[in-house]
Structures are given as structure tokens and as C-alpha cells.
Regions:
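N-terminal glycine-/serine-/threonine-rich phosphate-binding loop
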Residues: 1-45
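Short beta-strand segments
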Residues: 9-13, 50-51, 98, 127-129, ...
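Charged helix-capping and loop-helix junction motifs
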Residues: 25-30, 110-113, 138-143, 193-195
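Polyanion-binding loop/helix "lid" in catalytic or ligand-binding cores
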Residues: 32-35, 85, 130-131, 175-210
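Alpha-helix C-terminal capping segments
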Residues: 40-41, 82-92, 144-152, 200-206
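Loop/turn-to-beta-strand initiation segments
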Residues: 43-47, 122-125
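Ligand-binding beta-strand-loop-alpha-helix segment within the catalytic cores
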Residues: 61-125, 140
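Internal active-site segments that recognize and position negatively charged phosphoryl groups
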Residues: 113-165
Length: 210
């Protein structure tokens, strides 16, 4: 029997925290928090990178300085991570936020050894601030943190329910593909965690679930 992954890195869309046009939906937030708490209670070590799509997206910033726009997105991830830390703790779990942008009165400054230790203690570890640098997406950040945490598996929780022939948010004719290998997705040029593949040369494929 294949052994379950012990250390998991999850990329969670910020849009998952809001519904019906709201930035934050408390019922959804608590639901996600309970799921994360339950996963940690099984003994799995869980780290989470959250996007900021419910607060700020790069496509809103075409007329802004790109660095400023990216810094706004990074700060949005801090807000989302603080929100989810609270949700995990309200549902019986233990959590900590490490930020790549120093703000010690709000969350812990990111340190590889401290984050690994927190995961080994059974805390849900939230990685805020992206990679700490502009011009890199949170998909890139989760690959970086997965490598640093020596994760066994990388999960991408996108704002769609699977892999489609095209972006279902843009193309009403997009069709869900119920079963596809990562290699086939790449061959067909489907957009499945494309930043992950670009940053790892495809090495993430074996341990990547979307």
C-alpha cells in the first residue's frame, strides 16, 4: 500500500474565501478552516500558500507601477492568511502565519527552520507575502515553499473544479476533462499550474494534484 504523504503544501485561491461578490464569506472561511484543522489532526503536516484574488488582482493594475501593484497583492495574502489562521484556531486547530514581508507585530518573519519546526509540531503553517518579491505569482511562491519545506506533495486548489479544455471562467464552451495525466496536459498545452511547471521544469508533476 502506498504511504500517504506526510508533509503537504497547499495553494489555495483567495477567491475561495469569498462568495456572492463578497471579499470574505464567514461560512466558507470556517468551512475551509475546519477542513484544514481536520487534515492536520490526521497527522499530516500542512503548509498553505493563499492568493489574494478576493482582494486584489494584477489585471486591475494596468495603469499602476508594477512593483506597487505586486506589493499590494502580497499584503492581500497577509490579510487572507491572518483570516485563515483565525478560522483554523476557531475550529480546534493550531496555526501560525509566517510572512516573507517583515511585520513582526502581526505575524512571524519567515524562516525555513522555524516553519519546518512549526509543521512538525502539527500546526497549520500559513505562508504569507508570496515569495517576498514582485513579479512572481503565488504559484511560484508555493513551489519555493514546497522545496524549502521538503514537501511530499503539492496541491493546487484552483477556482475551478478540475482540468478543462479552456478556462471555464472565460470560455462557456470549455469542457471538463475527468481524467488526464500531467504529461498529457502539458502536451495539450492546457493551463494547469503553469507557473509551477515553469519554475520546476516539470519536476513537480509527480507530486502535484489540481
Amino acid at each position: 500500500m502506498k504511504e500517504s504523504p506526510k508533509r503537504i503544501l497547499l495553494k489555495l485561491s483567495g477567491e475561495a474565501l469569498g462568495e456572492n461578490g463578497r471579499l470574505f464569506d464567514q461560512d466558507m472561511i470556517l468551512r475551509v478552516g475546519r477542513i484544514l484543522s481536520d487534515v492536520a489532526a490526521t497527522g499530516a503536516q500542512l503548509g498553505v500558500v493563499i492568493g489574494a484574488g478576493n482582494i486584489w488582482r494584477g489585471r486591475q493594475s494596468k495603469e499602476m507601477d508594477a512593483v506597487t501593484a505586486d506589493h499590494m497583492g502580497m499584503l492581500g495574502t497577509v490579510i487572507n492568511c491572518l483570516c485563515m489562521r483565525d478560522a483554523v484556531e476557531r475550529t480546534g486547530g493550531h496555526a501560525v502565519v509566517f510572512s516573507a514581508i517583515d511585520m513582526p507585530r502581526v505575524c512571524e518573519p519567515y524562516n525555513v527552520q522555524s516553519a519546518r519546526q512549526a509543521m512538525s509540531e502539527g500546526k497549520v503553517v500559513f505562508f504569507a507575502g508570496g515569495s517576498g518579491n514582485p513579479f512572481f505569482t503565488t504559484d511560484t511562491a508555493v513551489v519555493l515553499r514546497a522545496a524549502e519545506m521538503q514537501a511530499d506533495m503539492l496541491l493546487l486548489a484552483k477556482n475551478v473544479d478540475g482540468v478543462y479544455t479552456a478556462d471555464p471562467n472565460k470560455d462557456p464552451n470549455a469542457q471538463l476533462i475527468p481524467d488526464i495525466s500531467y504529461a498529457e496536459a502539458l502536451e495539450r498545452r492546457l493551463r494547469v499550474g503553469e507557473d509551477v511547471v515553469e519554475q520546476t521544469g516539470g519536476d513537480a508533476a509527480a507530486g502535484l494534484l489540481v
